[in-house]
Amino acid sequence: MNSRFKSRLAAALVAVCCSIPFAHANDVTGAGASFVYPVMSKWSADYRGATGKQVNYQSIGSGGGIAQIKAATVDFGSSDAPLKPEELAKYGLAQFPSVIGGVVPIVNVAGVAPGALKLDGPTLAGIFLGRIARWNDPAIVTLNPGLALPDQKITVVHRSDGSGTTFNFVNYLSKVSPEWKAQVGEGTSVPWPAGIGGKGNEGVTAYVKQVKGGIGYVELSYALQNRLAHASLKNAAGRFVQPSEESFAAAAASADWARSRDFFLVMTNAPGEASWPITATNFILVHKQPKNVAGARNARDFFKWVYANGDAQARELDYVPLPDTLVKQIEAYWAQNLTF
């Protein structure tokens, strides 16, 4: 190695070593739900613009986010499947909501416009069980008398990874279909009786776009951004409703957060004539006594900024911001449970 190259290498190493602490001292690392990735990306970009601090969020699914925060390899985890208080206590974790959204069935059927297809819970369960296998099945046709449905195979697309989106979807199916509850049940991963798997909301969206006759389930933003047709669903009040910020907010209005322990609450199949039946909450997980105190504090500060400044970005992407009363409960929870 010649002396000139050695000098250049030494100078480069000095520059890198000196710059890294300053570039990353205020960074935040997070991982988890793809459900929240669209709004998390927007929040992160705006937060960097406002504060100069970087939030690095990996969209790896709720299961991955839970695993990473338990292992303390990130400053925060993100999951649409809340952890029970007993599990939080076991790993020394705190849990609080970030935003509310909705899971929607998406379809790739020629001639079916967004919102035109009507489905109820038992029929949706029958499709994902593989029992209803063609688009002109009488169960679907009966719900859609004015819609021309083809004699076409239904291809079910589900998640292949541990998923909070799946948790809320199958939790809903278990509530509305005894058949589903008995045969499949609920969880972040389930033994799917039919279909193909895609990783993340992104993977399910991509498969449904590619496969004619496909049906899957994703957070609403993925359907809208990819111009995929979504179905309307029959809710607990017996009304067909469209997924929207308004129908998600209607479902969220019934949530009694004050009585929940560690914010453990699932709001699928919520009451109310205007409620979307697969409304879901994204939850943030942090260590109560973190090894990386600075990173945990930076994560808390990021979400404090989100609650104060992130409502417009959430609404722009058809999520529902948390009400002020819930934000105050979260701040009180932080004061009681976080040591940093």
Role assignments for model-derived ranges:
Residues 24-340:
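Flexible loop/hinge segments at secondary-structure junctions
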Residues 10-21:
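Bacterial N-terminal signal peptides
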Residues 1-3, 22, 90:
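Residues that act as N-cap/strand-start positions at coil-to-secondary-structure junctions
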Residues 2-11:
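Bacterial N-terminal signal peptides that target proteins for export
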